[in-house]
Amino acid sequence: MFQEYLRCQVCFREVFKNEHLCDECKSSLPFVKKGHYCKHCGRVTKIAGEYCDVCKNNLTAIDVGRSVFSYEGNGSRLVTLYKFHGRRYLKKFFAEEMYKIYIEDGIRDYSPDLIVYVPMTKRAERKRGFNQGLWLAEEFSKLTRIPISHSIVKVKETPHQVGLNRKQRLENLEGAFHLKSKKEFFGKTVIIVDDVTTTGATAEMVAEKLKSAGVKRVILMTIASVGYIKKEGDM
């Protein structure tokens, strides 16, 4: 049976060998340049080796962060197809690109113990029909052989975050996450796998919850990140 992913997901040309993108579109993806990311959250930066405005001006529970590409152009298109249109098969491409970073940028050297993903409330997951973060975590776990923890749950519905600054998002997320078990996290190095870093508020709240359980180090790995632009009210 002819499968949908045998056509490039950007330009719809026919592709071969079960590829999701043609060579031309893959080369056009805005991959994060070596070193051009915030050392803490992995957000793309213009100057190599600098911190983003958020991490420069705030204490953060995230110790190390990396993103595959910038959330723009064909990068944002692919994430949108995956996140909002359920193109599940893209998880393999995303996980493979994250795995390259895991090996080449030395994330493996931190000897991570567990992978977690950003949970959704049961109601939100039923409405969407899937959790794209879980899909990604499962695929990344296969490649790294790091087990997934399902102990983080979201217990509070939160208002739509689009258009809100970091401070407003953090306020919305207060009390939204709960750990079913703290023992499994104590002294561990944990990777948070997520789709997009925008203000970083969601990952920060998850990281804080992990640190409260005694996690030694939190690593954030995302498909894409938004080059941060300060909004009124941000710190």
Predicted regions and their residues:
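Glycine-rich phosphate/pyrophosphate-handling loop used in enzymes and phosphotransfer proteins
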Residues: 1-193, 198-235
